[in-house]
Amino acid sequence: MGSTALGGGAPARLGLAPKDGVFGSNLKQCGGFMLKTTPKVGSSSVRVRASVASSPQKQHSPKTSGVKSGEEVRIAVLGASGYTGAEIVRLLANHPQFRIKVMTADRKAGEQFGSVFPHLITQDLPNLVAVKDADFSNVDAVFCCLPHGTTQEIIKGLPQELKIVDLSADFRLRDINEYAEWYGHSHRAPELQQEAVYGLTEVLRNEIRNARLVANPGCYPTSIQLPLVPLIKAKLIKVSNIIIDAKSGVSGAGRGAKEANLYTEIAEGIHAYGIKGHRHVPEIEQGLSEAAESKVTISFTPNLICMKRGMQSTMFVEMAPGVTANDLYQHLKSTYEGEEFVKLLNGSSVPHTRHVVGSNYCFMNVFEDRIPGRAIIISVIDNLVKGASGQAVQNLNLMMGLPENTGLQYQPLFP
């Protein structure tokens, strides 16, 4: 992987150092229950415990950074029964060093993972357990794939030495008042909110490398910030009139049973949603504002399209005086030269979601608008990979001192 950052990147979410839990290192309070962190003596396997009562136990030595080639990194996946959790498991199946030791899914506790996701039945995995029964004593790092609003207390209760990548929205916004406004409840871990580093890998890789807690970006923000952040930092486009039309596959809405996501409701159609204010808007505006060093607002309309996975973002921008669409193209080309997972297409090639499905790639291109002074930028990603689980693995690779592409060299599926 290349190491080019976008003009040095936006300010990272670096702040308060991790604090010791009030219950010490063996037992951690977590929203009304206790997380067990005692090891099983003489065994490397995961032990699931229903009781939190125990005598003091010897602590394991976590691998926090600089992992050697071939050295095992022990992984916990929280919320493994959702789409992003399952995608983490799929990606790690071919990872040479990450080994899953703990998998949680409260509603599927006690079940085998292969019975929940039969396409992964060949994998040797631990049974699913409830979060409250999970034993983190044999774990070095955590992928948290739980819904927003549920992760704050859980992450507060995890052992302080663990590396954590959170795929929810709980730690993405720097302003806790803005979080409360958009998500409808106050933030319950403001000290972690200050500590967390935003995980847009190609922009903030140096900060991610040294982080303990990374807030993995949302899918729409990833597809939009990757092309726009470098252009805004270079002052090649105006920030006063950015219009974005984005389309996502249905998996972006999650695996929960919802009437709006039934086949008969979405088949052979496309519809806009979140028109007045999608929750990814403040995340996008936060990243663009940091790039501009001034407040940026956008017009953003997401659409749900009848396909399983994939995302396309079409961005309509006004160029700075004297700037051409080719200038935008050349700047993006030089910015992402050497980057493995961000590719600028040649000539008039139009990015297609089908060409990135199953991969960690972001394909993009720039087109001249028929209106003088304006340009159209199109980017595509797989919303479950580069827009979620793939970027999460990319980030943890960085945090553990591994090459970013480790376990992610999947080519897109076609047809």
From Swiss-Prot:
Q: What is its main location?
A: plastid
Which GO cellular component terms are attached? chloroplast
Recorded catalytic activity of this chain's protein: N-acetyl-L-glutamate 5-semialdehyde + phosphate + NADP(+) = N-acetyl-L-glutamyl 5-phosphate + NADPH + H(+)
The pathway where this protein functions is: Amino-acid biosynthesis; L-arginine biosynthesis; N(2)-acetyl-L-ornithine from L-glutamate: step 3/4
Subcellular location(s): the record lists:
Plastid, Chloroplast
Check the record and name the SMART domains matching this protein: Semialdhyde_dh
GO molecular function annotations of the record: N-acetyl-gamma-glutamyl-phosphate reductase activity; NAD binding; NADP+ binding
Compositionally biased, Polar residues: which spans? Answer: 56-67
Specify the transit peptide boundaries: 1-74
SUPFAM superfamilies xrefs: Glyceraldehyde-3-phosphate dehydrogenase-like, C-terminal domain, NAD(P)-binding Rossmann-fold domains
Give the positions the UniProt entry annotates as the active site: 219
Could you say which enzyme class this protein belongs to? oxidoreductase
Coiled-coil intervals: none
According to its UniProt record, the EC number is: 1.2.1.38
The domain of life for this entry's organism is Eukaryota
Q: Where is this region: Disordered?
A: 48-68
Q: Which UniProt keywords apply?
A: Amino-acid biosynthesis, Arginine biosynthesis, Chloroplast, NADP, Oxidoreductase, Plastid, Transit peptide
What family, per the record?
Belongs to the NAGSA dehydrogenase family. Type 1 subfamily.
Quaternary structure note: Homotetramer.
**Protein name, as recorded:** Probable N-acetyl-gamma-glutamyl-phosphate reductase, chloroplastic
Q: Tell me which species this is from.
A: Oryza sativa subsp. japonica
